[in-house]
Amino acid sequence: MATREQLADEAARARKVRHLVDLSTSLIQQSGMTRRDAEHLVQMVRERILNLFPDGEETYELVYAPRFRRLIDEFARPDAGVLLQFPGPRR
C-alpha cells in the first residue's frame, strides 16, 4: 500500500503533467508556431512527462499523442518550403 508521501508525490507529478500539457496546447493553438516548432515542443513535453512517470509511455501514446497530433494538424503553420532555383533557358 502506498504511503501518504508517495500519494502526495504522485499527485504533485500529475499536476506538473497537467500544467505542461495545458501550457503546450495553448502555445500550439495561439502562437502561430510552425509545424516543426510544435513537434519539437511536443517532443520536449513527452520527454518531461516520461521523466516524471517513467512507466507512462503507453499512457502518453494513448492519451496525449493523439491530442497533440490533432492540435498540430489544426493549428501549426506549415514549414517554409525550400525554393530551388533552376538555371534560366539556354541561349
How would you label these PLM feature ranges?
Residues 1-91:
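Surface-exposed peri-terminal alpha-helical interaction modules
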